[in-house]
């Protein structure tokens, strides 16, 4: 037994070293080229290039057919996980169809999305975080029902097809300096129930910034198309994520 434990420890150490090396490399074909003047031309966005450590994770999970066991995507598991993380058990008011929306979304993910293991992991974590925030928003409204009576004065609504400049227009409006133009930060759209200042705000901002860093690791040039930081302005569409029936899930 001691010999086995020592061998397992050695193997684990070697795997850790290998993964550390692989994490510095990227697998797959080049997805972009850079010209001499620094301009970036994206060439293979349909077949993106990922860190080798991600490719290795996908291969490992797929080879051993462990995806359903390691990364469950069922409503009971997700709700229980979100409840355990928050200590809350109420996710919506009576008559709110959020649960049927969640069920339909999960069925669609399993039947249509054809996710890799890392894609399934990210979807699972996003769903859990979404449910956590849904529970926190529900609690906040129960404690402060006056929130629902705050009038929305002349909201500015931007609509358009993807890649037509809607984000740029939104960001431009946030820079206007006009006192009547309010906006949310990326951190606020992901964690709307968090306090606007103090330790809770700092924790929320840190968590969101860590998520931004992870996205940068996964997709190093994403910021060239869409700059994202925890405290930068962001479209409010992520507020709809908690309905499980909004644009970010499509």
PLM regions and their residue ranges:
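Long, basic/Gly/Ser/Thr-rich N-terminal segments
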Residues: 2-145
């Amino acid at each position: 037994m001691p010999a086995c434990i020592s061998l397992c420890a050695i193997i684990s150490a070697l795997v850790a070293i290998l993964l550390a090396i692989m994490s510095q490399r990227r697998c797959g074909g080049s997805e972009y080229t850079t010209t001499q003047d620094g301009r970036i031309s994206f060439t293979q966005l349909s077949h993106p290039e990922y860190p080798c450590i991600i490719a290795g994770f996908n291969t490992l999970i797929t080879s051993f057919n462990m995806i359903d066991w390691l990364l469950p995507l069922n409503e009971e598991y997700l709700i229980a996980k979100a409840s355990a993380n928050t200590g809350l058990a109420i996710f919506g008011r009576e008559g709110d169809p959020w649960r049927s929306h969640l069920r339909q979304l999960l069925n669609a993910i399993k039947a249509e999305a054809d996710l890799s293991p890392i894609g399934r992991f990210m979807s699972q974590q996003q769903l859990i975080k979404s449910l956590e925030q849904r529970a926190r928003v529900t609690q906040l409204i129960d404690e402060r029902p006056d929130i629902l009576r705050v009038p929305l004065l002349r909201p500015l609504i931007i609509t358009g097809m993807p890649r037509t400049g809607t984000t740029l227009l939104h960001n431009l409006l946030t820079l206007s300096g006009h006192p009547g133009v309010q906006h949310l930060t990326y951190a606020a759209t992901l964690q709307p129930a968090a306090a606007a200042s103090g330790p809770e705000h700092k924790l929320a901002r840190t968590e969101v910034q860590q998520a931004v860093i992870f996205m940068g690791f996964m997709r190093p040039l994403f910021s060239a198309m869409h700059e994202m930081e925890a405290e930068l302005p962001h479209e409010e569409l992520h507020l709809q994520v908690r309905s499980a029936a909004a644009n970010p899930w499509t």
